[in-house]
């Protein structure tokens, strides 16, 4: 994980740790001109590692985004941001996207009153995301919310959360300015 962060820069969905400054790293002493291929590859890898996707999943999302009207890049980021695991991360119910994937896989999360155990589930506007009524599920989410470093003001405007009921609501499709990943 840390090798990926050192290579590609800060990936907030992968871990909360930040890479060291460029002066400390030996491999950045040489300034080599970066080719167009390398730039595109690094940006693709940022997407893959940040959202926890396989190559095949990313290609499928690119194909879907290409069919929709509008900028393919913006539509791709909207598709990735509307995944259930990413929404849990944005709501502060999990500290990282892999942590959110684990919550979903272990069946702690309900969407509109139904258990969803697929992290790539595409959320729609007006979806209500809650935890199971079991004490263990509520305790897990409570720990994440209590230890969250993200203040309530930084919650994207397409999401609302009720921390006391462990409930989140998707208001609308995400606006491009709220996407936390810097992509060229």
From Swiss-Prot:
- Entry GO MF terms: rRNA binding; structural constituent of ribosome
Q: Where is the S4 RNA-binding domain?
A: 82-143
Q: Which GO terms describe its cellular component?
A: chloroplast; small ribosomal subunit
The residues forming a coiled coil are none
Subcellular location per UniProt equals: Plastid, Chloroplast
Q: Which Gene3D superfamilies match?
A: Ribosomal Protein S4 Delta 41, Chain A, domain 1, RNA-binding S4 domain
Keywords, sorted A to Z: Chloroplast, Plastid, Ribonucleoprotein, Ribosomal protein, RNA-binding, rRNA-binding
Q: Which domain of life is it from?
A: Eukaryota
According to its UniProt entry, one GO biological process term is: translation
Known InterPro entries for this protein?
Answer: Ribosomal_uS4, Ribosomal_uS4_bac-type, Ribosomal_uS4_CS, Ribosomal_uS4_N, S4_RNA-bd, S4_RNA-bd_sf
Keyword check for Cytoplasm, yes or no: no
Similarity section = Belongs to the universal ribosomal protein uS4 family.
Q: How does it assemble?
A: Part of the 30S ribosomal subunit. Contacts protein S5. The interaction surface between S4 and S5 is involved in control of translational fidelity.
Return the PANTHER family for the record.
30S 40S RIBOSOMAL PROTEIN, SMALL RIBOSOMAL SUBUNIT PROTEIN US4M
Say what the protein does.
One of the primary rRNA binding proteins, it binds directly to 16S rRNA where it nucleates assembly of the body of the 30S subunit. With S5 and S12 plays an important role in translational accuracy.
Protein name stated in the entry:
Small ribosomal subunit protein uS4c
Recorded source organism is Patersonia fragilis (Short purple-flag)
